[in-house]
Swiss-Prot record:
SUPFAM superfamilies: Bacterial exopeptidase dimerisation domain, Zn-dependent exopeptidases. GO terms for molecular function: hydrolase activity. Gene3D superfamilies: 3.30.70.360, Zn peptidases. Belongs to the peptidase M20 family. It holds the Pfam family M20_dimer. InterPro entries: Amidohydrolase, Bact_exopeptidase_dim_dom, Peptidase_M20, Peptidase_M20_dimer. Its EC number is 3.-.-.-. It comes from the Bacteria. This is Uncharacterized hydrolase SAR1410. The keyword Calcium does not apply.
Amino acid sequence: MNELEFVTKHRRHLHQHPELSLHEFETTAYIKAFLDSLNIKYDCPLETGVIAYLEGNGSHTIAYRADIDALPILEENDVPYRSQSDHVMHACGHDGHTTTLMLFVQRCKDMQDAGQLPQNVVFIFQPAEETGGGANRLIKAGAFDKYPIEAVFGIHVNPFADEGIAVIRDEEITASATEYRFFLTGLSSHVADKEQGHSCGEALQHVLTQISQIQQFHLNGLKRNIVHIGHFKAGEAINTVPSNGYLEGTIRTYDIDDLTIVKNQMHKIAESVKLLFNVDCEVKFAEGYPPTINSPKLRTQIEDALIKADLNVYDKPTPFLFGEDFSFYGQQLAPAYFVFIGTRNEDKGFVTGLHTSYLNFDEKVLINVVNFYENLLNNYKEV
């Protein structure tokens, strides 16, 4: 089959069989079977995900990453390759990322067989990007300890940019993403005896108000930060003083100092609840994703490789507010660079955003990505 047939076949198979973070068992088996067909050795440091390696002629080792997990979304696309999993969908394009890396593996294997693979290559089929921090899990598991990786590259499809556009930016390209949760515990009573209770309802209103003021009064208005409240609840019955409350949301920022400010303010809010309402309040933070930092030292190589792949380069003036665990590779492993590849095609109706039930794209864009990857490999220079 030709390369367009290859990416169409594999992407649509993966699209029909999406799996949630840390549950990508069939996807992992599919990738392993593909690698087995090429006689390529691989490791599985975690229950899901695959790390493959090909030795080249040069002394450098570079890595390419694709995330393989999907989202808990009911697909609404009316296409033959629609998701067959109930309320699970590749709504973030990871089926395309995985397929791209599979084709690149095949190209590299062909080069190796011909004695023409210029450098050593590590292929990262990573689980749990959406939730679970799969990149950090792999690093902590020692998945890359035996590889002297000098640089890590990755891409993400981007339906906000037209086909043929590659969006890049040095330094921060995505925000940090940190989840927070408030837990409130008061004392229940009948509403007729409300003075006997300690209401989590009023306490939760206070928390909501104070969180909404963090961005206005404690963060620099010239910076793009998000302190988002996603879900909250208090009590169970309409005639009872609620004895419990719960609130959760996400923080998006590019600046670690700003994140520290937000966390400190939230701890103060929790303390104030006890003083004002006699309600116990605790705030917890889930391990978040740091900002994705693109190494300026790799910029020239990235731009040249994109242009040679017939992609027009757009230098984004401000970072995206997406969170992305590719950030851990640049933070802990090696200099890294992350590129957004445009997939928007109005004629075909491919216009909806990431994490939506209608996300779709033309598989031909994936071949440009593989060309970009190969150009990077052929012209890699140590930084």
